[in-house]
């Protein structure tokens, strides 16, 4: 390496270290928010970032470009007034380490609510109003909250509070906002959080891995610490939107759509506004909860996105992604996609929305709302739930009740599909009696589809659902999807870590004083190094191992080293 390049490298390291220290200073803020961007329309530059709060945050050029284009509706002439929606932005700048609180959040939250190391969520509030004092005659500006957390409901409400206040008061209020967020408690799964912000107290519940456990009641939330707030906003869910409202126009095809999302099929949602398409994409992803959607999703996607070419290629098989779009250009560019959902632009009443047809011929794709696909579902519809939902429309049942009915049905359907898989994967664990403290850590057996199918006759979905159909065919397709790969990788990792813990616990209780008798020095040294290696691996893999087990393992190491000559003791102590 030359002197110049070495000097440059050291400078870069110093810059990175400085940024990390500043980031740590704002750790409480970054538990919730990466940054807040103000995006404006510049006559010479077009969309441009006017300011980033806090000021130390550096976005890469590509991240800045994506934020700018996603912050404004694609064809904003029809979006007068205020427009809210959310986006997903690929992270490609400097690697930002999650805070300790976010790492702990990921460990304790359900998989479908965990952070994604490769993406940010962006929550957008766009305002366009006439203003004759400005050169173009319009005021156009967006506030974008960028975060790792998928709390669509909470951040939507935060955006709705922050943006109008900023438009009214200016940068001074934004400085106050970031300081106040920096005082918030961390997002702890299983707890109610109280988040004060410019006179409003937001209260909501952060779900834990037992996502079906009873959420604390409003009465429990009512006992909040004393905050100086002019009003309180209680959110029964931090992450759930109004599922039924989003899916109302296509509710007849809810089981077909559930299969498409489950199988990670390419879907494009075409709508007249970013709000409509982002809400629909969110509702589709939520259909398979508690299973995590592991393919890509873009609640709102534009022709300027850095992945535009990647997703609009003429390849025979489009990528596994759900795209939400508004630009009419996509109607032609993506017409070869196998599954297209068109959402009505108008505010037609519910009864009209439910007359949307399904087309079997993609060539007739036009402006009519509907589900355009040639996909043939593996399972039959559950007519009982559809009748309930249609009856609810006729009787004007409240939307939140309709959403609760639909959500419960879809969760039960997903669980009926996944329980046989969960039951089977548990059988891949070696028997505890076969786990020896003196041998290599065993690994789970490999997944065998034929062995799994053999379990279905006695322990298949029919135990928990009355829905008929080709369940085996659905499983076969599922095994080729990113959703299966993601689920299996997570479960296999959990089983492997569990085996590590079981073996280390056995090793910590083993009688090594007896074991050392008759052993060669090389065997004893090897055992010490292996125990240390196992401990180091648990640290790297973040395996949850108790403090007492670690202490006992150190005692076992001491049991061995006490029998070794002093020169070997010194070498081992030096290496530890």
Enumerate the predicted regions with their spans.
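Acidic, Ser/Thr/Pro/Gly-enriched alpha-helical scaffold modules and adjacent low-complexity linkers
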Residues: 2-576
């Amino acid at each position: 390496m030359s002197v110049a390049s070495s000097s440059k490298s050291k400078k870069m390291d110093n810059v990175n270290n400085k940024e990390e220290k500043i980031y740590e200073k704002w750790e409480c803020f970054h538990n919730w928010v990466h940054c807040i961007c103000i995006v404006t329309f510049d006559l010479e530059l077009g969309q441009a970032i006017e300011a980033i709060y806090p000021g130390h945050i550096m976005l890469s050029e590509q991240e800045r470009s994506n934020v700018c284009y996603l912050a404004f509706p694609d064809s904003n002439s029809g979006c007068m007034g205020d427009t809210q929606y959310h986006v997903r932005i690929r992270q490609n700048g400097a690697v930002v380490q999650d805070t300790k609180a976010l790492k702990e959040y990921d460990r304790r939250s359900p998989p479908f609510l965990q952070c994604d190391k490769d993406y940010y969520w962006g929550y957008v509030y766009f305002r366009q109003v006439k203003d004759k004092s400005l050169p173009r005659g319009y005021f156009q500006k967006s506030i974008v909250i960028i975060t790792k957390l998928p709390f669509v409901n909470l951040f939507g409400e935060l955006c709705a509070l922050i943006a109008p206040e900023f438009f009214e008061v200016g940068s001074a209020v934004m400085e106050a906002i970031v300081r106040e967020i920096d005082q918030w408690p961390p997002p702890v799964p299983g707890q109610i959080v109280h988040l004060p912000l410019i006179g409003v107290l937001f209260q909501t519940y952060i779900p834990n891995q037992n996502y079906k456990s009873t959420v604390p009641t409003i009465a429990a939330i009512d006992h909040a610490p004393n905050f100086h707030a002019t009003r309180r906003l209680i959110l029964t869910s931090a992450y759930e939107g109004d599922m039924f409202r989003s899916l109302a126009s296509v509710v007849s095809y809810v089981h077909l759509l559930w299969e498409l999302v489950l199988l990670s099929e390419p879907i494009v949602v075409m709508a007249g506004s970013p709000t409509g398409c982002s809400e629909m994409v969110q509702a589709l992803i939520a259909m398979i909860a508690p299973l995590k959607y592991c393919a890509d999703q873009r609640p709102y996607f534009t022709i300027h996105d850095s992945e535009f070419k990647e997703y609009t290629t003429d390849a025979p098989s489009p990528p596994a992604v759900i795209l939400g779009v508004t630009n009419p250009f996509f109607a032609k560019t993506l017409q070869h996609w196998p599954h297209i959902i068109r959402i009505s632009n108008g505010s037609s009443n519910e009864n009209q929305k439910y007359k949307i047809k399904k087309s079997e011929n993609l060539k007739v794709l036009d402006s009519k709302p509907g589900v355009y696909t040639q996909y043939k579902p593996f399972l039959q519809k559950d007519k009982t739930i559809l009748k309930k939902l249609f009856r609810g429309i006729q009787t004007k049942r409240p939307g939140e009740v309709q959403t609760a009915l639909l959500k419960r049905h879809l969760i039960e359907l997903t669980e009926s599909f996944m329980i046989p898989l969960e039951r089977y994967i548990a059988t891949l664990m070696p028997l505890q009696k076969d786990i020896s403290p003196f041998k290599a850590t065993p690994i789970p057996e490999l997944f065998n589809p034929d062995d799994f199918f053999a379990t279905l006759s006695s322990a298949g979905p029919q135990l928990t659902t009355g829905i008929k159909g080709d369940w085996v065919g659905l499983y076969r397709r599922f095994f080729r999807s990113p959703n299966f790969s993601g689920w299996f990788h997570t479960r296999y990792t959990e089983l492997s870590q569990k085996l590590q813990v079981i073996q280390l616990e056995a090793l910590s209780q083993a009688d090594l004083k007896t074991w050392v008798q008759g052993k060669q020095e090389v065997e004893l040294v090897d055992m010490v190094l292996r125990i240390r290696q196992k401990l180091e691996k648990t640290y790297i893999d973040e395996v949850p191992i108790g403090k007492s087990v670690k202490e006992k393992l150190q005692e076992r190491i001491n049991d061995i080293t006490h029998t070794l000559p002093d020169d070997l003791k010194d070498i081992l102590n030096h290496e530890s």
